[in-house]
Amino acid sequence: RRVCLPLILLAPCASTPNRFFPAFSRDRLQLRLTLAEATTAFYHTVAGLANSDIAISGVSLNFYTVELAREVQAQIDSMTGGKYDMMCNDYIHASSSVVAGTTAHTATLGFTSGSLERVSVSHRVSGNIGNVLKHSFSRSSANLSQWQLAVNNTLYPARPLLVDGVSNAEVISELLIADHALHNFGVSANFNSNGATQASYFNVSDASGVVPGSFLTACELESFAGSDKVYAGINTVSATTQLQLEYNNTSNNGDAVSTTAVPNNCTLDIYGLRTVKISLDMRQLGTYEIFV
């Protein structure tokens, strides 16, 4: 099987606005990939899959480059003073865990950023991870009822984001807002079979079975999310950043659901989208520096 992995989540590939990335620094540019265990990365109906059963071959890095004439490069170098500053999006990750029966949980994230723009939260059944007979990346709602982000006791959003476990209209709308897609008519969303309101997919509260879940919730933190010229996320440098979650067995519209609190031991994956500055000064060290 041939697989293509677009490097869309790496800072050099997510400059804002889109810019070419200088490849003439005095230090080598390296791409490091860490592979998961085979039992986590793959799903199989038969147990016993080992890393040695998987072979990866024909690996190549394909990228687009522009080579400038020496005179043009000299003009650009003169205009910039030999210093190239680029603003980029970058993802950071934190993890936590909740045990079955939990009704409230607070996770300290340690996110450090001058402009934290978005936070996304997912729950995975811990027993699924590393089990080739289960979907390791299956996401469940875990009976989540509401959540907020606390930065030095300031709450984002000001009102908790509610999860009703039935239609999840607020979760879906906030997810689209965080993706800058709620008002974008060029983005399509599926609300029909296997879509957002399908109980056995997006709304599944217990993803320990063979049917994978797709629940994901996110919060937009930028004041001017529609502009690529204004960086208006929240400042979390030297701040205590915590995720506050509540779980219960009654949805916010009063409809009872089948399971009390968190149904399984779950692993939380929290992703933060932040803005970083990458700087290359060819008149000094000639190596890249990253500022958060």
Residue ranges of model-derived segments:
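Flexible assembly/topogenesis modules
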Residues: 1-292
